[in-house]
Design a protein with these regions (language model features):
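Active-site-adjacent structural elements that line small-molecule/cofactor binding pockets in enzymes
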Residues: 4-318
């Protein structure tokens, strides 16, 4: 189960979900910078402990406006700051375990005090794996170098995975003498399954709006360029500035939508997800599953069956 910071905190929801003894728990993603590395480390340590090692710590930078204006925290430079954050977390984990004293002197985080009474002490499971959300080449390469896994952005296509994600992860991993195959690759999908064409189209339209929403971000324009659709972000932003929400979605025509969205009946979606992500993703996240549950509390079981069917035909690559 992949749980985001959105309205409610990812960590408290992960703690509640830990009561389900057979599911893995991922914060996917939690916003890093507004929380001190010590705060994040303490929460992750406890979640790893209470879940018997089923928790993975997923972190992201968010964007400048949210970090500075919503959280009142520092943002720049996000890439190096995230690298330093991960280094601080690993130093704290080692101090909790008692293998090293806390003495971390990073570019942005300096930590040197952990009295015994304030340390949670060792736990009987490994340190929580640290996964980073990454989009651009620098962040992907850095994640390949320092992280245990990568959260791919929901605005992903096979071309983006092949041309951007995998090559940069390989470059980063090679710097530290490991293979990119050692990394967990967590890929969200705008899967749009349904038992009727109306149900499928409902999720397709939701996906269309999400592609337009994410596609309005200038930093993601290159993903459309890779598809031979230059100028897509500019057209979406023009509609956005005019307050034309329907117009934003209309920029994403059906052919473009199909690059991001896998739709069909439930069985077809399983096959198509498997074909797209087999030998690439170690975990596929069904982006709309939580939304389906929020609308209809009986719907989650059907999405769970889809996930189990996908796992059966596409065993984890890692």
């Amino acid at each position: 189960m992949c749980i985001r910071d959105r309205g409610r905190t990812a960590y408290l929801s992960c703690a509640a979900a830990a009561l389900a003894a057979e599911i893995d728990l991922l914060s996917g993603i939690a916003v890093a910078f507004p929380r001190s590395p010590m705060v994040t480390a303490a929460v992750a340590w406890e979640l790893a402990d209470v879940s018997s090692g089923r928790f993975r710590l997923g972190l992201g930078t968010q964007v400048r406006a949210h970090v500075e204006r919503r959280y009142g925290s520092e943002f720049d430079p996000p890439g190096p700051r995230m690298r330093d954050y991960v280094g601080a977390l690993r130093a704290i984990f080692a101090a909790y375990r008692g293998t090293d004293d806390l003495d971390y002197d990073g570019e942005f985080w300096k930590l040197s005090l952990l009295p015994a009474m304030w340390s949670p002490g060792p736990i009987a499971v490994p340190d929580p794996p640290i996964d980073i959300a990454a989009v651009n080449p620098w962040m992907l390469e850095m994640a390949g170098e320092v992280a245990d896994g990568v959260h791919v952005h929901p605005l992903n296509t096979p071309v983006y995975l092949d041309q951007s994600v995998l090559p940069n992860l390989r470059t980063g991993s090679a710097k530290v003498g490991r293979s990119a195959a050692d990394l967990e690759l967590i890929v969200p999908s705008f899967a749009a399954p349904g038992s009727t064409s109306e149900e499928v189209n409902q999720w397709r339209e939701m996906a269309r709006m999400q592609v337009a929403f994410y596609g309005s971000t200038p930093n993601y324009a290159f993903i459309f360029d890779q598809l031979g659709r230059p100028g897509t972000t500019e057209r979406i932003r023009a509609k956005q500035k005019a307050g034309d929400i329907a117009g934003m979605a209309a920029v994403v025509d059906d052919e473009l939508l199909d690059e991001f969205c896998i739709s069909g009946d439930w069985a077809d979606v399983v096959d198509r997800l498997s074909n797209r992500y087999r030998n690439v993703a170690t975990r596929v996240v069904l982006y709309f599953a939580g939304m389906a549950w929020a609308r209809d509390r009986t719907a989650l079981g059907r999405w769970g069956e889809l996930a189990l069917a996908l796992r059966a035909v596409s065993p984890p690559t890692g």
